[in-house]
Every structure is written in C-alpha cells, then in structure tokens.
C-alpha cells in the first residue's frame, strides 16, 4: 500500500549557467565583501563541472517515486545525479539522494585562493607554518608619503635625533654655553664685568642678567631727584648690583629694587599732594600706600625717615602763623582794604588767607626749596587744614558747605494783574487829572481813592525816568482818555468756575437788545479817540514805548470799594460777558 503521508515535491530545473554564478547578496557583487562573509563561490570553477551532461527529466521517474530534498544547508556544493527507480512496483524503497558532495580528493584541480597577496609568502620564521609579515611596520613609520607635510614642532624633536647630532647641526657652540648659577658665584669680579659688557650671542634661556633690571630701576631722572636726601643711596645700590650674581633666575632682586623705587616716591600722609605734576600718583597707589604693612616696609631702607614722604615737622619756619590763637594779625595790605577784608581774621578765613598769601609771597621760595626741604608747600597747607579740623570738632572738614534756603515769593493776583496792565498799556499820563474831558467822556475821580507811587520806567534807550502814575482799583472798569481802560482781566472765580459774588441774571434779558447798539458806539468811540491820544502823548518817549514796564509798590495796599463801585462793576461785567458770549 503506498504511503499516503509522503509529499510529492516537484523542483524546476535551474539553468546550468546560473548555478555557476553566486546569487547577489546585499545588491552588489564585491569580491572583498563576499570573501569576508565566507562565500567563496566567486572563484572560477573548472571546465569539467561545466561540461557535465544535462540531468534527466522528471517525467522519466515514476509518480510513485517521491523526490526528496536534503534539508541541510551548507556552503558545500553537491553534484546532481539521476535518480534510480525501482523495478518492483509493490515494494517502495527510500529514494537515494540526488545530490552527492564532491570529494576534495577527486581529479578536479582547483586553483588555490590567494587573497590580497601580491607575491608568494616566504617562510623564514623558525616556527613552522608561520609566513613572514606582508607589511613591515618599521618601514611604515619611517616612510613618508608624498602628501605628507611635516610640522615644525615634530621636526624639532625627530625620532632619529642621533643622526642630527652626528652631522653637527647643533646651533649652540662650545663658546656660547650658558653658565650655571653656582659657577658664576665662584668667578671673580673681572669675569662678571666682562659678561656684563658683552652678552653671549647664542640663544639664551629665560634667565635675564640682573644688571639690566637694576640699572633701569635705579637710574631715574637726576634732574627731578637732584638734591633730595635719597640721592646718596644710588652709589650703594649700584655697588650692590655689580657684586651680585650675573644671572638671577627668579629676578627677585630686580623686583625688590623696583618696589623700593616706587615706595620711596609715594607720600605716607593721608591728604598730601604730589610735589610736581610729573610725580603725581593715582588714587589706587595712594590707598595701597596708606595700608602698608610692616612686612612691606621691610624692603625699604633704614633711612626712610628722611624721604620726602615722611611728615618730619608740621610747623614750617618760613610761614609765621600762630595756629593756637583764634585771631592773628595780618599786614595792612591795600588789597585787603579794597576787597573789604577785616584786619582780624578768624579760623573760618584761615584757608583763604593761606591761599592768597602763600601763592604770592612763597611761590618762588617754594620752588627753590622743593628739592631740598623735607616737606612741600602743598603738604604743609593740607596739614594745616587737618589740624584745624581736629581742633574744632564741630567744624566739618569739607569745602562744600551748601545750606538750602527757602525763598517765599508772595503770589498775589492783584500784583500780577497790575504788571499785566502796565505792560499792555504803553502810555501813561503825567500831569493830567482824571477830571479832564477828552472827546466828551468824563471820568469821575471819586470812584476810587487815588494812590500815587514812585515808579522807575525803563526805556529801550537805557534811561531811567521817575513817573507819577495814578493807579486805580484792579477790578474797576473806567473810561479814561476816550477809551475803556481795563485794569484787570476776568476774576479767578469766574474763569475757574468757582462760586463768587451773586450776579443778577435778569439784567441779561434787558441788555440783549441794547448790546448791539452799545457795541457799535463803543467801537466807533475807540477808533475816533485813538488818533487824538497818539498826537497828545507823542512828546513823552518813555511813556509811549511799547517795551516799557512799570511795577507799582503799593499794589498790595488797596482799600475796599464802596457799594456804588460794586454795583457798576456787576452791571458792566454782565455786559462784558454777554458781548463775548455772542461771538
């Protein structure tokens, strides 16, 4: 009975040309990548395998004979042979495999694979089977390709340093060797002077000769320090510099000398000034000098007390000033009499007297004794100021004594209105009473009490004239010289909307019809009387000037108005408001 569990598999015959070629992996056929992955099928196969006879067709085999495929996957290639059929139909034997592996001992000679080898390997090693190295690493380190660019730093210390020494390419000679510090101490003074005069021309180390530093630190401008008590120290410092060693590795000595040169020039007092403009020090140097510690003072010489910075004496013999007395006599100089200075000056005027006297009397003397005296004139003056501040503890040691003062300016509307009226009216009448009639208009003199005041009137010519002006009430509307004279503007209560005096509004109804007629008559009278007033006052230049200004001294002393003036003011004010409201 045939086995029904067996599965018949039909395999299509592949092309024999395609079997010799390796299927593409990763989409390319690169030999090196295939060799690394372990696929060696890219080697050429011998011609015997290609000339094999074609396999038999699958139809020659019976249907009962199933085809078996080996399930093992290996890179070993199998040869294809025709399947063998069994004559007996009743018996079913296991089919023999169609693929048999090729024996490596067969007659097919395959060439030996040689990957990346340009020549045959040589076996010179004592170990059997170990070929010689293909790449010599020693040659790779020393060989430079054409694209290689050497670096200066790498060339300064090449690996084959002995070659350069043998060739004698060293720049330093036997006569240009640097002396050690211990050797220079043993050498005599003559050799030291020789090295100071002539330095070696070869490349020196960071060590510098101490002579250059010491001479730069010591040799200062002799004109500025001539006659000073510290000038005699230069000879001793130069001798010490010559006796010292030639090369100072840390340059400590030069730093000490430079520090000494700086500190001996700085003043030690708090408020002292510099002696000359070229010796001025910054504020930072002054603060560093004030906080000088004993350790920093150890580098200064023992004769520091005689330096210009030392406050030797507060009292100067050339200035005869007694600080203990409150008042001191001064010479009867006509300059003080002219300026109004008293002959007895207190402590408050001490600074001004010192500034004026010592600048004139001691200016030449201070220049002469600036180089030789232990204290300068400017330092002496500052010390006097400090002593005065210490003796009088209540006084403040400051020049800026500003005290705020309150200036109360009286603000009055009457004064302001009077000034405005004086500027707006360029003409003033002198010697003419208010009772005079011009153009048929009469002004009563008893409407307001007359007050005469003396006023200065300034004209553009620069002259001052005395005028008698008759000032009336600031709130009165009076007709003078043929025109309406407004001595004041509208009151502040009306302009600002504040409640003021009671006004009868019924008068506005009756005055509406008369407003147009009165306005026309008013304009006509103003234009008619304007020419007469100009001809009448042509002789008075001070009064007719448009730029003249008058200030009344009695503007604040106004008296109260009577009931008739108030009634007229209310009626005229209502008419004035009605005229402007219609426009």
Swiss-Prot record:
Keyword Phosphoprotein set for record: yes
DNA damage in keyword set: no
Stretches that traverse the bilayer: none
Stretches with biased composition (Polar residues): 1-24
One of the record's GO cellular component terms: cellular bud neck
Gene Ontology terms, MF aspect: protein kinase inhibitor activity
Modified residues (Phosphoserine): 393, 398, 516, 552
Post-translational modification: Phosphorylated by CDC28/CDK1.
Ranges of compositional bias, category Basic and acidic residues: 332-342, 354-366, 461-479
Source taxon at top rank: Eukaryota
Region of interest: Disordered: 1-31, 330-380, 457-486
UniProt GO BP: fungal-type cell wall organization
Keywords: Phosphoprotein, Protein kinase inhibitor
Function, as annotated: Overexpression affects chitinase expression, cell separation and budding pattern, and increases trehalose accumulation and heat resistance by inhibiting protein kinase CBK1. Overexpression also suppresses temperature-induced hyperosmosensitivity and sensitivity to cell wall degrading enzymes. Overexpression of both LRE1 and PBN1 confers resistance to laminarinase.
Listed name of the protein: Laminarase-resistance protein LRE1
